[in-house]
From Swiss-Prot:
Record topology, Vesicular segments: 122
Source organism: Arabidopsis thaliana (Mouse-ear cress)
GO cellular component labels: cytosol; endoplasmic reticulum membrane; Golgi membrane; plasma membrane
Gene Ontology BP terms: protein transport; vesicle-mediated transport
Membrane-topology descriptor: Single-pass type IV membrane protein
Gene3D superfamilies hit by this protein: 1.20.5.110
Annotated protein name in UniProt: Bet1-like SNARE 1-1
t-SNARE coiled-coil homology domain segment(s): 32-94
Gene that encodes the chain: BET11
Positions bearing Phosphoserine: 56
UniProt keywords, alphabetically: Coiled coil, Endoplasmic reticulum, ER-Golgi transport, Golgi apparatus, Membrane, Phosphoprotein, Protein transport, Transmembrane, Transmembrane helix, Transport
Amino acid sequence: MNPRREPRGGRSSLFDGIEEGGIRAASSYSHEINEHENERALEGLQDRVILLKRLSGDINEEVDTHNRMLDRMGNDMDSSRGFLSGTMDRFKTVFETKSSRRMLTLVASFVGLFLVIYYLTR
């Protein structure tokens, strides 16, 4: 056996333990830093998720409100359409009759009513 190799072998075995411990300490420290950074990033993501959840809830409420308003408006339009179609049917009935006497009476009554209202408000 070579005497020179034995001290190197002994020395390397001595320093191997120290280096491994140093590496282990550095890697555990690095692991703790990574864990801390991950926790901060997770908290930031959690805040964003909460904000998005609140925002989506507000959007949902706004959409529901608009849908109810549009439904009411549609119902009002349907009732107005029914009223106007009834009025148009009455006008058709009046104008389809060939009686000029009836038409003359209708026009004269409108003109007379207009004149009475005009003189009363004057």
